[in-house]
């Protein structure tokens, strides 16, 4: 493929997993809406899907819409599978430094909160990120995005949260916007000022309350005025920000016009799932991690989903695996309860240094019991809904953005089967080829 055209016809697919039909939950999450056959093709015009189906039908649709087949660049899928471009709905894209030392400490028994309390964990990355230049952070972001693209990811949520002061958080959001302008990928910026209490507050007797006041009174107004962040996230967890503090921050964010999401119940039942359900009416899109939700939290998320205000449970199995956990988020309980489930990398230097959604899918199938079709829905259409983009990306149907991956195999089942590998032939973004493995 040349990469210069926005009008593209991919022919000869063995199957196309369209994920058409919107957000998946319950039994519907296992339906990838797959079209089979060696003559299935996808047509993109002007950066959007024009038609998908049997080759003769698609050709007729192209001509019926007044287009000439000669106007399309053609690409032979050679019997491979076509899926929507993958959507990574939870990443910490911009940071400086690595944390392999604490990884080794954890292997010897040190706990996450123990490392954080000693100034490690998030705080060590905050110090390194504050000290890094703009160009250093941009270079790291570019490298990571390139690796993600090569693994099939075309849309990426990117959080701030490694500065924890007004100027630094604004800088991270601005750098995210700059990367979005230069990258073929779509970046969705999230403000995460409430990621941890920074070192300069920790000597105070009221450290957490004082920092919550700073997030609400200083950081949020500046972020809203900047106009880059689309949503606000909070680390709602015992020992970080409790349910009451998280509610205050997220309510203020909603008043500022931001969508809501939260790190919820990662380490222990902390009321995060319940809070996410409570805030569904204020625009809460997702509750993430959920490795240790309460039964009440699962039920609350199921109720709002049934009521038509779904909050997506965005699960992060690579994090649990990298931390050496012996339990993972109860994905089957969420799906069986009718809660829509997404998967994401949680890319970050401390607890999930992975850039591969296919690897995340593999872990989810092995450790959480998801089927390959459920896992694919979780990194496409459901992940898109977790970002408020369900009407734009995440499925292959007319009018949707033409974000596509052509794989070197023909079945959905093989996608998580190839552990740690991404046998990709090509990645297309808005109808343009942006990656091709030769």
Question: Which positions does each model-derived feature cover?
Answer:
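Active-site core of metal-dependent hydrolases
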Residues: 169-170, 182-326
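N-terminal metal-binding scaffold of metallo-dependent hydrolase/deaminase domains
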Residues: 1-63, 414
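Alpha-helical scaffold segments that flank or form the walls of functional sites
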Residues: 41-43, 80-82, 99-158, 174-181, ...
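C-terminal cap of metal-dependent C-N hydrolases
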Residues: 27-32, 379-381, 398-438
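Active-site-adjacent C-terminal substructures of enzyme catalytic domains
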Residues: 259-260, 269-395, 407-411, 419, ...
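Histidine-centered catalytic micro-motifs
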Residues: 84-96, 160, 259-267
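Divalent metal-coordination and catalytic microenvironments
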Residues: 13, 42, 47, 79, ...
